[in-house]
Amino acid sequence: ISGASVYDLPSWYLSISNNSGDSEIWRFESQQWRMSKSLYEDRKGYERNSPSTWVENVTMPVLIWTGEKDPQINPNQSIAFYLALRRLNKKVVFLNYSNESHSLLKKESQVDLYYRFNDWLIYHLKDESPAEWIIKGLK
């Protein structure tokens, strides 16, 4: 299960934050990602840490969710992950929560995601029949 996640580090490195309007470079070079070097000083390091580099190796079904108005991580990161998996004929379902952020704040969305997590895990871990939304999503 992948939620509101980064798929392609180089593209996020070279993007503008929806929150601040500033570059995302600081996250990588001196903060959260702790890369300590620029993309241009350590391209291989960025690629090595980027899920987009390894997407062909995915073997398990993936449930991806994102908030459509996420100011932290552009929802296009989740969409790109989904599209890559679909193109590679991997089993994947994408959930897009409209008018939600990086964290789901609406009770309705939280409950929905909880039940979908539950359905997903029961289907894949307990080998029970899939919920209708899973069947539709995997087509």
For each predicted feature, which ranges?
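Active-site-proximal cap/loop segments of hydrolase catalytic domains
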Residues: 1-139
